[in-house]
Amino acid sequence: MMISVKSRLKIYKSGTFLVALILLAGCSKSNSSGGSGNVVVKKPDTTVTVVDTTILAPKAVTKTNTQKVYVHYLPWFETPATSGTGKWGQHWTMANEDPDVILPNGRREIASYFYPMIGPYASSDRDVIDYHLLLMKYSGIDGVVIDWYGVQNVDDYPLNKRNTDSIFSRVPATGLQFSICYEDATLAQDKAVANIDTITAAKSDFSYLQSAYFGSSSYVKINNQPLLLCFGPQGLKTPNDWQQAFSVLTTKPRLLTLDYADADAGSSASGEFVWVDSGNLNSLQSFYTNRTPGLNTWFAGAYPGFMDFYKPGGWGNTLFLIDYNNTGTLQSTLSLAKSSNAQYLQLITWNDYGEGTMIEPTLDYNFSFLQTIQTYTGVSYTITELQLIYKWYTLRKKYVGNTAVEKQLTQAYYYLVSLNVAKATAIISALN
């Protein structure tokens, strides 16, 4: 396990961890691979064609807030159906949790203090991806920034890459945008496990990004440059490292590093993005006031709170705690982002359950974080549309294999991406 040496603390998980199967009193075991005991997550199958239906082009939501709002997304979750090992992925288990254990409250035992409304899921599951992207769209979120580990066959990086590809394949249909946050700390693991030179590995990673993503019309561009965030630098440590790694690219990305770190990338960097740390609002305000005037491009940040599971999960010590204050912390960080006059905002995060920064619907906070974001972005939608999307997802899972119903739900999906809520509601209500 690698720990960031930068000013922002984040745990990097790699390798195989011994999982202690803890059976709590009153708990039971389940072999189901999704939800809280009653939802089966189907294994993704990209060879299955979408049933015949009327495909509708996506329409953009209307927002009163002109700020571009993106959300940091973790694509690292696996179920027994998708992990390749028949086991739950380590980001649901950490070192000692077992999602096959059903707790007295009906929840699966996962490595988090919080619980997804749809239960623990697979990041490559198309239904999950569509559910997430639809929620983002109706919350006024413009796009997703995916945490990406590169292309090397090391640890769980291939699964991360597969899942990212799966998400990217679903983005255009929604009309949202897509970008990458490169975890260059993984380059050290590439070297340690596969003996791949750091620069060579980075070149392979960037070549793939250029061929697979950068050219897409759905990929985020700033001044015609593809946006690339880096959670560091940590692997590429000098300006020369970055120049060498970028030498394989025909178009230089608009590279943003972590706050106060752009000098490590030299002229290859175009700015920075702020991240959550123990200083909370003081750290954000200091970045906006003292740092951003000298930056070409920068991202503000907003988050609901911070409560990591690392110590109880057996992955080291607790980092720090930021109280959620219901939705108070999210509202405060959004308010600072607005007053900073930032052109771009990154929501931290969609689904980092290990650190408790998730804004997606949970059994703990329901839709409240997304409702707060709806108010911030100035969309006309409310919890009603968010609940409708949740119902759509549950029906997708309920009627797996029922071709006639799947066709109706596919049509409802296209009504949703084209903002025809009334027609989507009619289909979903009839089935529900």
Name each model-derived stretch:
Residues 1-11:
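N-terminal secretory signal peptides that target proteins for export/translocation
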Residues 7, 28, 41-42:
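Short, intrinsically disordered low-complexity segments
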Residues 10-18:
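Sec-dependent signal peptide recognition
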Residues 23-26:
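C-terminal motif of bacterial Sec signal peptides marking the signal peptidase cleavage site
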Residues 28-36:
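Bacterial lipoprotein signal-peptidase II cleavage site
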Residues 41-432:
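Glycan-processing catalytic domains of CAZymes
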